[in-house]
């Protein structure tokens, strides 16, 4: 069979002469119409350093695709900056953008009958958005990550964007002055690349590498290093090879490979958002996966990497000592990865890792040996209780206090909570509740990095709990619980919490409990009324109508289940 399995529908035969005429206008010649047409979904944008370098990577991939015998066609897809929109109404559009990215890539690739897709992305939702599209399309596909930002430096310590968020809390608490705040701001982001710790972007790029849909070692490269450009070019070559072999995305996106990705996220100490995104990718690929599968894998996979936000190092440090392949080799040797999973290169995971050392390098402590983990079990725990009958997600490593019972401090929006923290109204022992911020209620399930960073900056990170039906940034740490489901907007128990109620968060018992009698809860539930939608027109209104529970990945196309 020819390599242009799909695009021949628009390039072959006399009736397609008008189609060919238009393609000639964008560079096709007589000998190009039998070549595979390869889409390059380019997320380049100067909105954010995460995506500022993507144009050059897309160009390198385009050149390589052409040299390998394909016909590349570049098209744009969107991004929003989570870091810039954080703490504002604009953050409601962040998770929405995952769906827009997925829908836009699916739309273009299917409309133009492309034979393969290479997606280039950087900011948080670029990665899952692209993977959801690849899973729906099930054609040869590869992802090129824009790369991580290098750490900033100030007064002998490494800085990331989270340093700037935490500095706001420190300034409000009087722990640093305005000059110190400004200097941290000036040094936190020294150039192009995605946020440098094991936050959401680096977590998801690592997960994609574990899934086999990006090149080995590519997920921790620095955005501004030449090896990243070389990796983009090689990705184009590999994709053309995959088109010739008809190696499609769902051959990589299997139950086993998703279990591999979850294991790698746990070993890295990755973002809570990985739960949401991997559930959504599994849904798009028609692979059964539930929130409880994360808990099962967590209990057997240790945290091996000492990475920010709760650790000391950033992604470039991880790359220097072997990157994700080194972590995967350790897990493979421990029987915690499925080595028979296929990758886009045509090799299995085990074959890909064959030449990777069995142990991490000596004289470093970024990656620990399996026998000396940072934590014996994974860090993303699934909690349940009467406050989260469908489950919720807690990052339980890097915290000193693993259980808290305290009075609820209830806020119906992120802004109200942040104001209370910055004005000193939150005290040690409190359990902060931020609700009506879920997928439907926000809508858009905003990340609560500003409130959690303010709590850390105020010196309350070890003594205040926070629960929300919203999300957390990958940069969040502390005694925090997100993705509470059912959410407040649909009448979940979190909507029934009243100021001063006793709430227990117990990381070890995996419990989130409102300490109120069943009779009182029944009375409150009978009196509860749904709130009118915050938006009645536009994309947020559409999203609120379509989106599923966070426990199902907050997808927008779950219609028949």
Swiss-Prot record:
Task: Output one GO BP term.
Answer: isoleucine biosynthetic process
Enzyme Commission identifier(s): 4.2.1.9
- Output the Pfam families linked to this UniProt entry: ILV_EDD_C (PF24877), ILVD_EDD_N (PF00920)
Catalytic activity annotation? (2R)-2,3-dihydroxy-3-methylbutanoate = 3-methyl-2-oxobutanoate + H2O; (2R,3R)-2,3-dihydroxy-3-methylpentanoate = (S)-3-methyl-2-oxopentanoate + H2O
The pathway to which it is assigned is: Amino-acid biosynthesis; L-isoleucine biosynthesis; L-isoleucine from 2-oxobutanoate: step 3/4; Amino-acid biosynthesis; L-valine biosynthesis; L-valine from pyruvate: step 3/4
Q: Which residues make up the binding site for Mg(2+)?
A: 82, 124-125, 447
- Quote the record's binding site residues for [2Fe-2S] cluster: 50, 123, 195
Which SUPFAM superfamilies does the protein's record reference?
IlvD/EDD N-terminal domain-like, LeuD/IlvD-like
Q: Which GO terms describe its molecular function?
A: 2 iron, 2 sulfur cluster binding; dihydroxy-acid dehydratase activity; magnesium ion binding
* Modified positions (N6-carboxylysine) in chain numbering: 125
The active site consists of 473
**Which cofactors are named for this entry?**
[2Fe-2S] cluster; Mg(2+)
Task: Write down the InterPro entries for this protein, in alphabetical order.
Answer: DHAD_IlvD/Edd, Dihydro-acid_dehy_C, DihydroxyA_deHydtase, DiOHA_6PGluconate_deHydtase_CS, ILV_EDD_C, ILV_EDD_N, IlvD/EDD_N
Which UniProt keywords are listed? Answer: 2Fe-2S, Amino-acid biosynthesis, Branched-chain amino acid biosynthesis, Iron, Iron-sulfur, Lyase, Magnesium, Metal-binding
Provide the cofactor note recorded for this chain's UniProt entry.
Binds 1 [2Fe-2S] cluster per subunit. This cluster acts as a Lewis acid cofactor.
Q: Which PANTHER family match?
A: DIHYDROXY-ACID DEHYDRATASE DAD (PTHR21000), DIHYDROXY-ACID DEHYDRATASE, MITOCHONDRIAL (PTHR21000:SF5)
Q: Which family does it belong to?
A: Belongs to the IlvD/Edd family.
The record describes its quaternary structure and partners as: Homodimer.
Per its database record, what is this protein's job? Functions in the biosynthesis of branched-chain amino acids. Catalyzes the dehydration of (2R,3R)-2,3-dihydroxy-3-methylpentanoate (2,3-dihydroxy-3-methylvalerate) into 2-oxo-3-methylpentanoate (2-oxo-3-methylvalerate) and of (2R)-2,3-dihydroxy-3-methylbutanoate (2,3-dihydroxyisovalerate) into 2-oxo-3-methylbutanoate (2-oxoisovalerate), the penultimate precursor to L-isoleucine and L-valine, respectively.
Q: What is this protein called?
A: Dihydroxy-acid dehydratase
The primary gene name is ilvD
């Amino acid at each position: 069979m020819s390599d242009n399995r799909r695009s021949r529908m628009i390039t072959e035969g006399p009736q397609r002469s008008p189609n060919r005429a238009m393609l000639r206008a964008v560079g096709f010649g007589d000998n190009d119409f039998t070549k595979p047409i390869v889409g390059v979904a380019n997320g380049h944008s100067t909105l954010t350093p995460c995506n500022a370098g993507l144009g050059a990577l897309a160009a390198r991939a385009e050149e390589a695709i052409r040299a390998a015998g394909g016909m590349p066609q570049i098209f744009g897809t969107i991004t929003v900056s989570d870091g810039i929109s954080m703490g504002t109404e604009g953050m409601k559009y962040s998770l929405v953008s995952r769906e827009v990215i997925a829908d836009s890539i699916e739309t273009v690739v299917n409309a133009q009958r492309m034979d393969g897709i290479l997606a280039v992305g950087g900011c948080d939702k670029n990665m899952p958005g692209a993977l959801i599209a690849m899973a729906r399309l099930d054609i040869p596909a590869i992802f090129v990550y824009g790369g991580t930002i290098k750490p900033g430096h100030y007064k002998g310590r490494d800085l990331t964007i989270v340093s700037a968020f935490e500095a706001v809390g420190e300034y409000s608490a009087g722990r640093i002055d305005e000059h110190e705040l400004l200097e941290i701001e000036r040094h936190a982001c020294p150039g192009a690349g995605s946020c440098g710790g094991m936050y959401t972007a680096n977590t998801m790029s690592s997960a994609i590498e574990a899934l086999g849909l990006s090149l080995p070692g590519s997920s921790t490269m620095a955005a501004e290093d030449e090896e990243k450009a070389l990796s983009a070019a090689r990705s184009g070559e590999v994709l053309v090879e995959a088109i010739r072999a008809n190696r499609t995305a769902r051959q990589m996106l299997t139950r086993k490979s998703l279990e591999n990705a979850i294991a790698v996220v746990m070993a890295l100490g990755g973002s809570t958002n990985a739960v949401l995104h991997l559930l959504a990718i599994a849904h798009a690929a028609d692979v059964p996966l539930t929130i409880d599968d994360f808990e099962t894998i967590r209990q057997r996979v240790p945290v091996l990497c000492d990475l920010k936000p709760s650790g000391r190092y950033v992604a470039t440090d991880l790359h220097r000592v072997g990157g994700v392949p080194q972590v995967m080799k350790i897990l493979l040797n421990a029987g915690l990865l499925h080595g028979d999973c296929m990758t886009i290169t045509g090799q299995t995971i085990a074959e890909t890792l064959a030449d990777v050392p069995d142990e991490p390098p000596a004289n470093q402590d970024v990656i620990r040996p399996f026998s000396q983990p940072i934590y014996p079990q994974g860090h993303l725990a699934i909690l349940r209780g009467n406050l989260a009958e469908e489950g919720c997600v807690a990052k339980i490593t890097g915290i000193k206090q693993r259980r808290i019972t305290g009075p609820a401090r209830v806020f119906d929006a992120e802004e109200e909570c942040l104001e209370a923290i910055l004005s000193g109204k939150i005290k040690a022992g409190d359990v902060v509740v931020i609700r009506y911020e879920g997928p439907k209620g926000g809508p858009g399930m905003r990340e609560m990095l500003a409130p959690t960073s303010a709590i850390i900056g105020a010196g309350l990170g070890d003594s205040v709990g926070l629960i929300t039906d919203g999300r957390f940034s990958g940069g969040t740490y502390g005694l925090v619980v997100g993705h509470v489901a059912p959410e407040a907007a649909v009448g979940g128990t979190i909507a029934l919490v009243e100021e001063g109620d006793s709430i227990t968060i117990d990381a070890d018992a995996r419990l989130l409990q409102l300490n109120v009698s069943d009779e009182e809860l029944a009375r409150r539930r009978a009196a509860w009324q749904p709130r009118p939608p915050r938006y009645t027109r536009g994309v947020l209104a559409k999203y609120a109508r379509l989106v599923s529970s966070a426990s199902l990945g907050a997808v927008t196309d779950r219609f028949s289940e």
